[in-house]
Amino acid sequence: MMRRASQERRTTETKIKLHLQLDESENISIRTGVGFFDHMLTLFAKHGRFGLQIEAVGDMFVDAHHTVEDVGIVLGNCLREVLQNKEGMNRYGAAYVPMDEALGFVAIDISGRSYLVFQGELVNPKLGDFDTELTEEFFRAVAHAAHITLHARILYGNNTHHKIEALFKAFGRALREAVDKNEKIVGINSTKGML
């Protein structure tokens, strides 16, 4: 069974259409109106081997905050929907990813509990139309909407672009590991028998 989810979200601030395919990696198309964010989401999908299509229009005359946060909410909602059946799933995933001088780390638990730990210094406040503080807001929105525990950490680096890129790639790789099925896991990967 293919694990897919689609969702539309319309508010007075944003209009978002998102389609996620966990087990298909061919189709990646991201258009949010925030160039750097599009680049990061494309890297996330490519390195996670996910199909991901996003069309978003936001109130960019204000700033990119609502667009970035709402895309995170919709992506998290789609993840929660597509991961309802957790039988045979690894549940946990972690990845270190270098990007030149920067090193990013992400660990994920598909636990049914929403939690974010974010650590990292982003010295450059803006990359194009993207306020770099929105990196944490995006991960918080995804974690809370998806009901996952997510730890994202920039261990070191100098270039802000490289630091954020390492995190998004690590997020894709860690999520891929967590959602993959494992034939050695019988039922749900929890002593409780449910998540």
Curated annotation (Swiss-Prot):
Pathway: Amino-acid biosynthesis; L-histidine biosynthesis; L-histidine from 5-phospho-alpha-D-ribose 1-diphosphate: step 6/9. Pfam families: IGPD (PF00475). It comes from the Bacteria. CDD domains: IGPD. GO terms for cellular component: cytoplasm. Its EC number is 4.2.1.19. It catalyses: D-erythro-1-(imidazol-4-yl)glycerol 3-phosphate = 3-(imidazol-4-yl)-2-oxopropyl phosphate + H2O. GO terms for biological process: L-histidine biosynthetic process. GO terms for molecular function: imidazoleglycerol-phosphate dehydratase activity. It is found in: Cytoplasm. PROSITE patterns: IGP_DEHYDRATASE_1 (PS00954), IGP_DEHYDRATASE_2 (PS00955). It is an enzyme of class 4 (lyase). Its main location: cytoplasm. Keywords: Amino-acid biosynthesis, Cytoplasm, Histidine biosynthesis, Lyase. HAMAP family: HisB. Belongs to the imidazoleglycerol-phosphate dehydratase family. PANTHER family: IMIDAZOLEGLYCEROL-PHOSPHATE DEHYDRATASE (PTHR23133:SF2), IMIDAZOLEGLYCEROL-PHOSPHATE DEHYDRATASE HIS7 (PTHR23133). This is Imidazoleglycerol-phosphate dehydratase. It comes from Bacillus cytotoxicus (strain DSM 22905 / CIP 110041 / 391-98 / NVH 391-98).
